[in-house]
Amino acid sequence: MDLNSIKTEQRNSRTAQIDTMSTLSMVKLISEEDKKVAAAVGAEAEHIAQAVDVIAAQLKQGGRLVYSGCGTSGRLGVLDAVECPPTYSTDPGEVIGLIAGGNEAIFRAKEGAEDDEALGAEDLKKIGFGSKDVLVGIAASGRTPYVLGAMNYARKQGAHVIGISCNPGSQVEKTAEIAITPTPGPEVVTGSTRMKSGTAQKMVLNMLSTGAMIKLGKVYGNLMVDVKPTNAKLVERCKRIVCEATGVDYDTATEALEKCGYRAKVAIVMLKTGSDVHEAEQRLEAHEGRVAQAVGEN
């Protein structure tokens, strides 16, 4: 294996003397390199949009979004998955993050797990992965066996397969139905893909899950109307969302939320249409959970 041909493993000439720099110069240089990430992700907008549409369509049909990755890439997938239930009230099994080596690998590296191609497929089998689901394989280098094993298995099931890597021409790119390949260049510390590559992957994952949830009607304007208020901060956010969406005062928003079990969507429809809880629920159901349509704005 020639790692020199992999962009994420190449040496960054701009940071070759970073160990001799002052702390301020070092930090500024890292920041300058990080600025390349957003542009690299932006260059993949068309592919990201295609992936969002596929994910939203499959979730609407009862499929699941499954991330597969190793190390940093795997942890980023897990992070994105676990944030979906509180943010968008998704079922915990609707967006799933799989990491080579299992849950222990989230906190401590499991040596050799990423090199097991069969394990990638086996982890999909364990969750009953099928044709309605979508797999997103995440690997900075684009060559990780665990991820490729998962991607190949998913393709055999007839599922949509999306690949995220930071190395053009990689095996992940070739295996994916939709390849997303932001290329921010060699890392500040050679081969440390938790840095620019990891940031690029996190940005892409944000777009995939957020974009899909917006397409599914879980956002009204730019308000998080499907938030699950599981703590004090989120309860207050829920109240502010209803106030922002309807123009009512804090007490009126609180009263409406208490009537409908703190479901912001239902409270907004109630207040905007003068309906009771049951009628608001029916309006939302008739319009696939989209608040704008439920209140007659679109």
What are these regions (language model features)?
Residues 33-43, 109, 134-137:
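Short, basic, glycine/proline-bearing loop/turn elements
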Residues 31-37, 96-108, 220, 261:
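Gly-rich Lys/Arg/Thr-decorated short loops/hinges at beta-loop-alpha junctions or inter-strand turns
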Residues 191-201, 205, 228-241:
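EF-Ts-like protein-protein interaction surfaces
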Residues 43-58:
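A short, well-structured juxtamembrane/interface segment
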Residues 212-298:
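Short, amphipathic alpha-helical interaction segments embedded in low-complexity terminal/linker regions
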Residues 1-40:
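Cofactor-/ligand-binding subdomain signature composed of acidic, glycine-rich
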Residues 66-204, 212-214:
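Glycine-rich phosphate-binding loops that contact phosphosugars or nucleotide phosphates
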